[in-house]
Structure formats: C-alpha cells, structure tokens
Amino acid sequence: MTKITVIGAGSWGTALAMVLADNGHDVRIWGNRPELMDEINTKHENKRYLPGITLPSTIVAYSSLEEALVDVSTVLLVVPTKAYREVLQDMKKVISGPMTWIHASKGIEPGTSKRISEMIEEEIPEHLIRDVVVLSGPSHAEEVALRQATTVTSAAKRMEAAEEVQDLFMNHYFRVYTNPDIIGVELGGALKNIIALAAGITDGLGLGDNAKAALMTRGLTEIARLGRKMGGNPLTFAGLTGMGDLIVTCTSVHSRNWRAGNMLGKGHSLEEVLDSMGMVVEGVRTTKAAYELAEKMEVEMPITAALYDVLFNGKNVKDAVGSLMGRVRKHEVEAIPDLSR
C-alpha cells in the first residue's frame, strides 16, 4: 500500500483518486475549495465535477496543502496548466524529502512553451525529486469514475519509475502500458486538444464525416511533426497518447475541448464559450503555446495556425476552413527517420 496525495480535485483528479483507492492505497486529495473538500469527506461525492458518483469512503480530502502532504512520498498532480507554477511553489515550501512526482495534466505553458515535466523540474529543487512520471492516454474522467475499461500510458526517463506507477494504477478496469518517451507522451496529450477544438468546429459547422476524418488525420501529422522536432519518438504518436487520445477527444461529447469547438462552429464567441463551460478548456491555451513553439522551431502546423487565428485574431471559422482547403498542393507522406540508428 502506498500513501499518495492527489493535487487537484477536479473531475480527472477525483477519478484517478478512485482508481488508487480501489487498489487499496492510502489516498488523500487536495483542493482549494474547503466546501468541496467537506462534501467529499462527509457525503463521498464531488457534486461539482462528478455528480452522481459515489466515491470510496477511504479517500480523505484536505483544503490544507501542508496537511495533505504529511508523510507522503508520492504525489499525483492534476491541475490546469496555468496553475502549475503557483501550486509547485506552494508545495516546495512544505515538503522536506524526495518525492515521486506523477502528473496527469495535458498542456503546454504559453510564453515559455514548457512541457509540464519541465515546469516541475524547474520549480522543484533536485533533491526533492525522486522521479517525474507522466500518466496520459485516452481517458474521460466520467468513464473512469464508472469503472469502464480504460487504457493509458505511464512515461518516465527511468523505466523502473514508469513501471512503479504502472503497478500503482493497474487493475481490472484500468490498464497501464509503459513508454520511455516522456517528450512524445506529453506532447501528444497536449496537442490533441488543439485538434479536438478544430474537430468540434467542424461538427458545429456541419461539414460532415469526410472533413472530420481529414482534420483528425492531418492533425495527427502536425502533432507528430512537432513532436519529432522536439525529440519525441514518431511511434509514440501512433499509440495511446497520440492517435488514441486524439480519437477519444475528437469524437466524444465528454470532451470539453470538442464541446468548446462545437459552440465556436455554431457561431458563439470565445468569451461566451469559456463562460459557459465551467471547467478549464486546455486546448485554448495550448493552441497559443503550440503556435509560438511551431514558429520558434520552424515547424509547419497549418491547422494550429488557422485555429490560432480564430481564437486570438478574430478570424471567421468558415474563412479558416477555406484557407486550409485552399493551401498549395502537398505530398501526403513525409519521410520517417530510421529508428534503428
């Protein structure tokens, strides 16, 4: 049994806390809303983020970060990308020994273009880090909370660390594979949110299945193109954290990025969309970060660029589609590097 604290009591953090509790671990969950923490402790429900789901009574919720981290050597971070640095800075004030840092968030920091594992390594002193591990894959919180079959990937630089996290989470409904490609796993999980927004726009405009299939396929090409340039393994993007996550996020009504895009496609403004969602839409911030990163790395990402214009330059969604369809002719298949070298 492992004592583990989940940082972030949204839908995904709560669902993962359930998986860990089902596996017999000593699970704590921290959130910054005392009333929500009280509800988890007394009613065993997170009505705001997972209404109707009964949580294991063994999950203990804290609104005090210091209390939540007492005698804990493993943490699971599940907070919005924009909150990471602030949360990490608060955490390092109250921990004293090395920890395994698992994160299950999907995003890139605008301005710095940093992946989340890089933010952890920048903010937390080296002597307080045992390992940094990423948990990612096609996984809607609503389905995990219902204990429906789900498969994800655990990625770390040190394979033993990825396997330790694999063992923490594996059970009859939650299967975990391992992958040493932490760069590819993080980028796949983050960048697919951009394509999910675009897929929602496609559906909102009523463009049909042909257009959506093309968008998803060419979107995966963009993800892999940037991922390769950043040092990711091309094969990772054909796996759970690339193609798998892209499929589930672009095709499900559970996806908040798809829902946001769908509203944009139906004519709502970005401000209206974000006000109505009630939860973070990571794809909006990730679009900005990925656009900046693609410019910096000189990587062609036309779908990302078109979505950036829609979100931040006020371009009409129909005009954005027209500009993509009217691009100069291209070859479909790009050269794949020899991975045996």
Curated annotation (Swiss-Prot):
Q: Which domain of life is it from?
A: Bacteria
Q: Pfam families under this entry?
A: NAD_Gly3P_dh_C, NAD_Gly3P_dh_N
Residues binding sn-glycerol 3-phosphate, per UniProt: 106, 137, 139, 192, 245, 255-257
Active site annotated at which positions? 192
Cellular component annotations (GO), alphabetically ordered: cytosol
Pathway recorded for this protein: Membrane lipid metabolism; glycerophospholipid metabolism
Cellular compartments annotated = Cytoplasm
Q: Which UniProt keywords apply?
A: Cytoplasm, Lipid biosynthesis, Lipid metabolism, NAD, NADP, Nucleotide-binding, Oxidoreductase, Phospholipid biosynthesis, Phospholipid metabolism
Q: What is its EC number?
A: 1.1.1.94
Gene3D superfamilies, per the entry = N-(1-d-carboxylethyl)-l-norvaline Dehydrogenase, domain 2 (1.10.1040.10), NAD(P)-binding Rossmann-like Domain (3.40.50.720)
User: Which reaction is the catalytic activity of this chain?
Assistant: sn-glycerol 3-phosphate + NAD(+) = dihydroxyacetone phosphate + NADH + H(+); sn-glycerol 3-phosphate + NADP(+) = dihydroxyacetone phosphate + NADPH + H(+)
Q: Which PROSITE patterns match?
A: NAD_G3PDH
Q: Fetch the PANTHER family from UniProt.
A: GLYCEROL-3-PHOSPHATE DEHYDROGENASE (PTHR11728), GLYCEROL-3-PHOSPHATE DEHYDROGENASE [NAD(+)] 2, CHLOROPLASTIC (PTHR11728:SF1)
Q: Which family does it belong to?
A: Belongs to the NAD-dependent glycerol-3-phosphate dehydrogenase family.
This one is known as Glycerol-3-phosphate dehydrogenase [NAD(P)+]
